[in-house]
Amino acid sequence: RDEFETDLVAVLTEEQLELWPPLQRQLIRDRLLPRGRLSGETLDVMGLVDEQEYADEVLLALLPALKTWDVNVTDALMARDNQMVENQGVLMSSMRTMDVSTGIDVLKMQGRLAETVRFVNDTAVEQIVLLLPADKTNQFKAIAQQRSYPRIYRATRTDRAYEDALELEELIPETLQAIMNLQDSMDDEIAMANGQLLSATHRGESQEQIDRMNRFAQRMSGGTTERADNPIDHAEKAKREIEDRYLELLRDLLTEEQIEELGGLKKRETREERRGG
């Protein structure tokens, strides 16, 4: 690939050479962004902005933030990719020889570089939200959150249950208003829970890969393989408890027939319940 790019640059005209650096960065992004493993690491900020089809004056206002992201994310992606290529053999060797400490050092560095890519993306989104007209900020922020962190911001079954409940026929006005009030309260609590889950994701997601390597080493040596305590698990559990509580509150407002029309509104089984524990 490098040889091809060198040959290509050699035949470009002076005018074409001026266009080469941004094109080269785009080629790097297209190749390396999809390889991200962390939430938020694969977000194509420029592509996301392009999808919104903003007016020219809006795009001009966003141009400084997009240029900064273009340069910074390309540098971060190259640093991440170079480290992975240079240390792939070291990582494989550490797994064969059970040299866990060396392997963990490599994974920690990979995690830090991946977090840098994510930070560049998150920062760009924050800057764009500040630069957008007020009537466009909420929509863009919501789309970026769902695209970057679907594990956190995608609609839940409880969200869908409330939306479907509001569409039920023959709801008396008092019940309709009560459902709307509960939905507002739930949205506030879920927003707080999502913030805590986002913080836990930033703290603990790259650690999960290290924990997996530790469990692999423990299994190979005949030791126990218990899952390490993870802040993401605790934050997800707290969010599920909120969802389940509001699902019960919704059930209390509806008749049995209405509950059946909404699919039963049963709480989601825990991992232990699915295993029969």
Model-derived features with residue positions:
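Charge-rich (acidic/polar
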Residues: 1-277
